[in-house]
Amino acid sequence: QAPKIIETITDNREDDGAGNYFYEFETENGIRQSVRGTPGAAGAVIKTGSFSFPLDDGTLAEFIFEADEYGYRVDSPLIPVAPPNPSHVEELLQIVAQLKAQGAQWNDQGERID
């Protein structure tokens, strides 16, 4: 059986020739993408945008992103997030920061060496 052909229902593209561009598309099965590009530092291109697609259960998977000289960052409610540190870990991190400010040092095994 031949695969079903999915039609593109929206396809917009703009490019000013100076490094700024925009494009967006949407397909009949609910896939969407929108991207804006601008010149960045040292020849880098800064891209921001979003994309989405329907999941099998009918809900929409939505993502926003930014890409630049520092890498690619994406955000979505679907991306797992680590739980917050327990309070005792936060207290220990504060103690370590105070010790570092006082000149304390540790080796690669975590042993204090000052």
UniProtKB/Swiss-Prot annotation:
GO terms for molecular function: structural constituent of cuticle. Arthrodial membrane. The keyword Ubl conjugation does not apply. Residues 18-83 form the Chitin-binding type R&R domain. The keyword Hydrolase does not apply. InterPro entries: CHIT_BIND_RR_consensus (IPR031311), Insect_cuticle (IPR000618). Keywords: Cuticle, Pyrrolidone carboxylic acid. The modification Pyrrolidone carboxylic acid is found at Q1. Pfam families: Chitin_bind_4 (PF00379). This is Cuticle protein AMP5. It comes from Homarus americanus (American lobster).
